[in-house]
From Swiss-Prot:
GO terms for cellular component: endoplasmic reticulum membrane. It catalyses: an alpha-D-Glc-(1->3)-alpha-D-Man-(1->2)-alpha-D-Man-(1->2)-alpha-D-Man-(1->3)-[alpha-D-Man-(1->2)-alpha-D-Man-(1->3)-[alpha-D-Man-(1->2)-alpha-D-Man-(1->6)]-alpha-D-Man-(1->6)]-beta-D-Man-(1->4)-beta-D-GlcNAc-(1->4)-alpha-D-GlcNAc-diphospho-di-trans,poly-cis-dolichol + a di-trans,poly-cis-dolichyl beta-D-glucosyl phosphate = an alpha-D-Glc-(1->3)-alpha-D-Glc-(1->3)-alpha-D-Man-(1->2)-alpha-D-Man-(1->2)-alpha-D-Man-(1->3)-[alpha-D-Man-(1->2)-alpha-D-Man-(1->3)-[alpha-D-Man-(1->2)-alpha-D-Man-(1->6)]-alpha-D-Man-(1->6)]-beta-D-Man-(1->4)-beta-D-GlcNAc-(1->4)-alpha-D-GlcNAc-diphospho-di-trans,poly-cis-dolichol + a di-trans,poly-cis-dolichyl phosphate + H(+). The keyword Nuclease does not apply. It holds the Pfam family Alg6_Alg8. The gene is algn-8. This is Dolichyl pyrophosphate Glc1Man9GlcNAc2 alpha-1,3-glucosyltransferase. The lineage of its organism: Eukaryota, Metazoa, Ecdysozoa, Nematoda, Chromadorea. It is found in: Endoplasmic reticulum membrane. It comes from Caenorhabditis elegans.
């Protein structure tokens, strides 16, 4: 299906579905926006931010007020004047419902169009995706953004205009990806003047522009002054257009009226239903302390009021009260730390969407009076970033599941209860299908067991809240199940933030240190023969051998194909070659290749054996070294120990600098003499097969095995569960060509073929 056909099909499906949702439940936000239309239509501009006939007063920035005035003009033009009556009590009719629902649907069409523009025209979206999967990445981005479950719940049922605002943010992302930084800044400034909650992204923009827009080499002042002036103009134009009419109408008082409505301080630390952030955990800790201390009769504390389910100011019973300024300080400090780390660690390579994710996360997690719907501000840039970097797919899936559970309490009527489950479950499977198309990775990589366990736990709490709580407790403890959902989702979101930070910064100094330390511990256990293994002590024990190898995509070396090729022994008949894709999570560390690949290889081998037990090999051959290693434990040792199968390391090359590291620089001259000796032996004895022991150091852990009449050799070292003599004898029977051991060669060729066909296209592999 072509791009245009996909966009039209998805648009038709989504708009048709949203039309079916017109009769669905609406929240108080429905009356909020109707009243705003009425206020902007019926009152002069100077009274927009003072009109208080209804409790649902205008509290969005002026651009949104102008948008409401535009909707009011359309309503008046088409005869929907009942929408434009200022009333103290809510007004609702079928005509009002139809008009306001369709106003959202038309905004959704704009949003879908912007999703298509960004997904199919952004030059940076698929730069780290293998060439043959790039179109899949673009299609996944479009479908996942256009059908975002949080937007359907919040806009098409609950009722808001988040899709229109998200479209403006995506336009800013698009301009950044195309390096039109002034247009991106202008778009963001427009967005802020529509809804000030998008200040969540502000620090992300600041840090990204400092790194990518401004110049800090050469004559800094001369180079940056015109850039700063241009940026300031781009940012100020929307603000001037937004507030100048109010200054003209009411002077400074007009600005004060806007500020009073936009930044109320009488709403309490958390919303009526706690958003899944740090303050939900803080409230819960305070409640637990109050209950325990009251039970033990230690001190006298006021009963907590934050479990009333009302929007109000409140005090904590035991823990210190938290002021708006205190939360702002936490937001700024946490943002500064993580964004500074992103600049230092990633320098100019970090994508803006990641800056936006971290900036929004800090505001959402520590912000004052955060609404659960604000999770949209995290999921949108996270969706974009996960497409750009497939390493984050599992984090994205977990985030959207947490978002779904946190949004469920918004819809509580019987029909909408089933509807919200259907929407979120459908989106979950859509996400799995399209993300799998981007990487071809197995589902186990996308949905780790720990995530599944947390979803089941949250699911049980949700079922209890919806179907059992009222039946068991009637009208008692109404807030308890909502609090349980808030706490569980807050805990999961905290863990997700930790995982995101680890995935982003963990490949730095700390993760390298940690990876080396754990590798060295494992190697100590390997040298002590702690791991159980089906050892090979005689050639009669060997009936089936297997070679294993990996090949990586050119544009993303973390995406690999693993192939394992099975052969009978000693007659060397091919039995099967099985391959699959994997994502390598850890970075490459010199002399620690096993850290990156060994566990992935061993897990894949065990999964193959589990599915096909008849293919369990007696020996596994790895492309690399075994005991011939600077620490005595190369790749083959790790794979053998982790899989429980005797292993042999077979390397095609013996690079001298690695050899020096392995046996010590003091033996450098001996190595050079030995290499020259081997060349002379092979040159003068072309028809003599056999091997030459690498006996510079004792005990001998490496044999150089000649490949037929070739002057080349392969380098054999024992891995785990087998000795060098037997390893060399087995390998000598596996040479069918003059390149390497046949099972390894077959695995290598197959993995390269699959990379070429499914990742890189027909370009020549390096």
């Amino acid at each position: 299906m072509g791009e245009v056909q996909l966009v039209l099909a998805v648009t038709a499906i989504l708009i048709s579905f949203k039309c079916l949702l017109i009769p669905a439940y609406v929240s108080t936000d429905f009356e909020v926006h109707r009243n705003w239309m009425a206020v902007t239509w019926q009152r002069p501009l100077c009274e927009w931010y003072t009109e208080a006939t209804s409790e649902w007063t205008l509290d969005y920035p002026p651009f949104f007020a102008y948008f409401e005035l535009g909707l009011a003009s359309v309503a008046h033009f088409f005869g929907f004047d009942e929408c434009l009556v200022i009333s103290k009590t809510p007004r609702f009719s079928r005509r009002i419902l139809i008009f306001q629902r369709f106003s959202v649907i038309f905004c959704d069409i704009l949003y879908i169009a912007v999703c298509a523009l960004y997904s199919f025209r952004s030059p940076r979206l698929v730069s780290r995706i293998p060439k043959k999967l790039q179109q899949n990445g673009r299609e996944a981005c479009f479908v996942l953004l256009a059908s975002l479950q949080a937007l359907i719940i919040c806009d098409s049922i609950h009722f808001q205009y988040n899709s229109m605002l998200t479209a403006i943010f995506l336009m800013s992302l698009f301009f950044i990806d195309t390096e039109r930084y002034l247009m991106a800044a202008l778009s963001y400034s427009i967005l802020l003047n529509f809804k000030h909650i998008y200040v969540y992204y502000a620090l992300g923009y600041v840090f990204y522009y400092l790194v990518n827009y401004f110049q800090f080499s050469g004559n800094v002042l001369l180079a940056n002054t015109p850039k700063a002036i241009s940026l300031a103009i781009a940012l100020l134009i929307p603000f001037c257009a937004s507030i100048f009419p109010f200054i003209h109408a009411s002077g400074v008082q007009g600005l004060q009226n806007i500020a009073t409505r936009l930044f109320p301080v009488s709403r309490g630390l958390t919303h009526a239903y706690w958003a899944p952030n740090f303050w939900a955990l803080y409230n819960f800790a305070d409640l637990c302390l109050y209950r325990v201390l009251s039970l033990l009769k230690i001190g006298k504390f006021d009963a907590p009021t934050y479990t009333s389910g009302l929007v109000q100011e409140y005090s904590h019973s035991v823990l210190p009260n938290v002021s708006p300024m205190g939360t702002l300080c936490l937001v700024v400090i946490s943002s500064m730390i993580v964004l500074t780390g992103l600049v230092i660690r990633r320098k100019d390579s970090a994508d803006f969407s990641l800056f936006a994710v971290f900036s929004a996360f800090c505001f959402f997690y520590f912000g004052y009076h955060v609404h659960e719907k604000a999770i949209i501000l995290v999921t949108v840039p996270m969706t974009v970033f996960a497409i750009k970097n497939p390493k984050y797919h599992s984090i994205l899936i977990h985030l959207t599941c947490i978002a779904s559970f946190s949004l469920f309490p918004l819809l509580f009527t019987p029909f909408e209860t089933l509807l919200k489950y259907a929407i979120c479950v459908s989106y979950f499977f859509i996400q799995l299908v399209f993300l799998k198309r981007v990487t071809l990775m197995p589902l186990s990589d996308l949905i780790p067991t720990r995530h599944v366990a947390s979803w089941l736990l949250m699911g049980m709490v949700e079922v209890y809240n919806t179907f059992l709580h009222k039946w068991l407790w009637t009208s008692r403890l109404p807030f308890a199940p909502l609090m349980a959902i808030s706490i569980l989702t807050a805990i999961e979101l905290t863990g997700l933030i930790g995982a995101l930070i680890w995935s982003t910064f963990g490949d730095g100094i700390f993760e390298i240190w940690w990876a080396k330390a754990t590798c060295q511990i494992r190697e100590r256990l390997i040298r002590d023969s702690t791991y159980s293994v089906q050892a090979v002590e005689d050639l009669d024990d060997v009936k089936l051998v297997a070679g294993i190898d990996t090949s990586a995509a050119k544009l993303n070396s973390d995406m690999v194909y693993i192939s394992v090729s099975f052969w009978t022994y000693p007659d060397l008949k091919h039995v099967a070659t099985i391959s699959d894709t994997r994502m390598l999570e850890l970075p490459y560390i010199p002399q620690y290749l096993a850290v990156r690949e060994a566990e992935v290889m061993a897990d894949f081998l065990k999964s193959v054996i589990t599915e096909r037990p008849e293919l369990r090999p007696d020996v596994i051959l790895c492309d690399g070294f075994g005991e011939f290693h600077s620490r005595g434990c190369g790749m083959a040792c790790h794979v053998g120990a982790l899989s429980g199968i005797a292993s042999i390391g077979v390397a095609k090359n013996l690079t001298l600098h690695h050899t020096y590291e392995t046996i010590g620089m003091e033996n450098k001259s001996k190595v050079d003499s030995f290499v020259e000796h081997c060349r002379e032996v092979y040159k003068n004895n072309k028809t003599s097969p056999g091997f030459i022991p690498f006996d510079i150091v004792e005990p001998v852990v490496l044999n150089i095995l000649r490949m037929g009449s070739s002057m080349n050799g392969v380098f054999v070292s024992a891995g785990y569960g087998i000795d060098l003599e037997l390893s060399t004898e087995i390998c000598s029977q596996l040479l069918l060509n003059n390149t390497t051991i046949e099972p390894i060669r077959a695995a290598d060729l197959e993995s390269r073929r699959l990379v070429r066909e499914n990742f890189d296209g027909n370009e020549k592999l390096e």
